Amino acid sequence: MNEFPKNDENDESDESDEDTAKDRVVVVTGAGTGIGRETARAFAAEGARVLAVGRRPEPLAETAGAYPSLIEPLAADITGPEAPEAVVAAALERFGQLDVLINNAGIVRSGQGVGGYDRTGIEALLATNLVAPVLLGQAALPALGDSRGVIVNVSTAVGQRGWPSNAVYAASKAALETVTRSWAVELAPRGIRVAAVAPGAIDTPIGDHSGYGPEQRAAVRKWQIEHTPLGRTGRPEEVAWAITQLASPRASFVTGVVLSVDGGALVG
């Protein structure tokens, strides 16, 4: 029978700094609230230096307030034509390197079923959920190649199973997952890992800006919980934990994976 080798009695079980985010530089988009905020704080808790990117200065300042010596806010619209290069330049100027890119920023719009779409709405969804992560990742490649870094994209459970009445949102995330898998192969020779998380129903403010009214949001949340085997919504910090694990040096043989963080919704 095969047995795992026993640890030397002098081995220390605690994580070394090489196994954590200590002294690494992380860029997190959509860091003003929800998953992005908790991800920025989770990396800072491990000793990483974090550039927290978002559109609104006030929420970013609140994010940074938890670890003011480690999290620096940067107010920027990542869909702007010069934003990807500007974000990377800011990280390099402030910290001198870039090790991890978390493409978390995303938007959702109220139900736009067949016949209800317009060009402006489609382009807005794709600009934030797909085009910006691709261009930001592309801008970060030289720095990530130098550090043999990591890209973690934030998708969604409906990117894998579709969302009736919100097909374009689901499609934008499905496309991001395809980019994740494709880049994992393409960038492996450069030592860059690429992975994604696919959250299910998470208790975040993203729905507040979706155009859904309170009753619609409550109905959607009720449906989500009913279709989640664990019977509840997830917490932003639960997704943040998964993101930090994928970005960890301990996950050095993990690339191309899309990790579901959905309480079992995809398989249930």
Predicted regions and their residues:
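Short C-terminal tail/terminal secondary-structure segment
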Residues: N2-F4, V108-G111, R161, T244, ...
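Conserved glycine-rich cofactor-binding loop
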Residues: G32-G34
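C-terminal substrate-recognition "lid" of short-chain dehydrogenase/reductases
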Residues: F95-G96, V134, A143-G145, R232-V261, ...
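Substrate-binding pocket helix/loop in short-chain dehydrogenase/reductase
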Residues: Q112-V114, D118-L126, Q224
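Active-site helix of classical SDR
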Residues: G137, S172, T180
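Alpha-helical segment proximal to the catalytic Tyr-Lys
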Residues: P142, V185-P189, S252
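Residue(s) in the substrate-gating loop at a strand-loop-helix junction
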Residues: T156
